[in-house]
Amino acid sequence: MPYQYKREPLTPDEANRLASACETHQERLIVWTLLDTGLRVSELAGLTREHIDWQNHRLMIYGKGGIYGTKSKRRIIPLTDRIRPLIDGHFAIHDTIGMTPRTIQRILKRIANKAHINRPVSPHVLRHTFAVAAVQKGISLPALQRLLGHDRLTTTEIYLNLSPEDVIREFREKW
């Protein structure tokens, strides 16, 4: 199997510092949504009012894959209590997120610097952070696979770059 670069997810402390460093509604919308949903940056940038199931508090994402390169694959992502008011507030006024993927990346980099995180932080690092946090909260790999929109479980496993401390802690809890 070819070498697969593994992005390092943020530690829980780094994720908390990043979330706490957000000062504006826009910053919280970006950081908290990425941390709580595992969306790809293109999916966040492309989010519109039509993607929200208001009654059931969830997002409907039409993502990568599908036949002939179309975005026909649909997945459903629940909105956490933390991001629901941000999404509701934003889309009560706006039809779209109103930011490009590059703008989201720049804003995230600025917040990471403000939070004194001394390594690269990108939307995809937050996607990995979401995946590790989901597993640590007890979400099954097949459920995580669906949340992330992966066709293959092996793709999802790439995201689970658990630290040695995580492995030891889980072993002690379960053994």
Summary of predicted features, one role per range:
Residues 2, 10-41:
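Basic, Lys/Arg- and aromatic-enriched nucleic-acid-binding interface segment
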Residues 4, 34-56:
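Short, charged phosphate-coordinating catalytic segments
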Residues 12, 46-85:
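Conserved tyrosine-mediated DNA breakage-rejoining catalytic core shared by Y-recombinases
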Residues 15, 27-28, 101, 105, ...:
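Short, leucine-enriched amphipathic alpha-helices that occur as contiguous helical runs
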Residues 33-34, 133-137, 147, 170:
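Short alpha-helical segment immediately N-terminal to, or the first helix within
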Residues 43-44, 120-121, 131, 138-152, ...:
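Active-site-proximal segment of tyrosine recombinases
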Residues 80-118:
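Active-site/catalytic core of tyrosine-dependent DNA strand-transfer enzymes
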Residues 148, 153-173:
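Catalytic-site neighborhood detector that most strongly recognizes the C-terminal catalytic loop/helix
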